[in-house]
Amino acid sequence: MAKVPDLFEDLKNCYSENEDYSSEIDHLSLNQKSFYDASYGPLREDHMNKFMSLDTSETSKTSRLSFKENVVMVTANGKILKKRRLSLNQFITDDDLEAIANDTEEEIIKPRSAHYSFQSNVKYNFMRVIHQECILNDALNQSIIRDMSGPYLMAATLNNLEEAVKFDMVAYVSEEDSQLPVTLRISKTQLFVSAQNEDEPVLLKEMPETPKIIKDETNLLFFWEKHGSMDYFKSVAHPKLFIATKQEKLVHMASGPPSITDFQILEK
């Protein structure tokens, strides 16, 4: 089993070359002895050739350095390949860690843009109706119909497509998105498909009129994606979830199989 040799000694040398580091972050502990004397055990096999954080909650009781300030990549033989000192309160993802290893230049990683639910200033403006009275069939050739037990939809195999729900698809546009957001409204009504959480049934939400601007009601919006002959509707409010069907289950939100997220749009 490989052991990590003197990681903290390496960091000590790094800090000693930059003595004014402590003045930049005045809340960090300056007791180097308690920090560098921290004990560490053998490197576990599942940590070899992977990124490790010097999280001092596991190595030192007095230091306040955290995962967000120092990231180190260590090989199986304990060699430090890269060190990165990051700014405080910076959100780090696995993709950011991959960037540390792949970048030839050392630089501070910029935080990613906010999730859609936090972009409260994003406005989606009405563009035009792009489909009228269309039918949605899933990959099993089931059509979307109303479920009369409540404001829900379900999928069923129909002999007569006149029994299927007819949808109007309305396109919207915003400055922030390159994808095409749409709403799905039951034709000749003001009932709009509204996304919910994963595995929860979509709801039919009644609006007083077709919205000209959508800002807070992003549950009504779906990014329409087309791959080959199949169509997909990804929630703007929940970007990992799609409108989906499943046998003996209401139309709901899902990230993929075993639910069916593939649809075909059938024109009137």
Curated annotation (Swiss-Prot):
Post-translational modification Phosphoserine, affected residues: 87
PTM: Acetylated within its nuclear localization sequence, which impacts subcellular localization.
GO BP terms, alphabetized: cellular response to heat; cellular response to lipopolysaccharide; cytokine-mediated signaling pathway; fever generation; immune response; positive regulation of cell division; positive regulation of gene expression; positive regulation of immature T cell proliferation in thymus
Assigned keywords, A-Z: Acetylation, Cytokine, Cytoplasm, Glycoprotein, Inflammatory response, Mitogen, Nucleus, Phosphoprotein, Pyrogen, Secreted
GO CC annotation: cytosol; extracellular space; nucleus
Pfam families reported in the protein's UniProt record: IL1 (PF00340), IL1_propep (PF02394)
Propeptide regions on this chain: 1-112
Disulfide bonds: none
Region annotation (Nuclear localization signal (NLS)) ranges: 82-86
Any one GO molecular-function label of the UniProt entry: cytokine activity
Family note: Belongs to the IL-1 family.
Domain-level remarks: The similarity among the IL-1 precursors suggests that the amino ends of these proteins serve some as yet undefined function.
Record-given protein name: Interleukin-1 alpha
Species annotation: Capra hircus (Goat)
Gene: IL1A
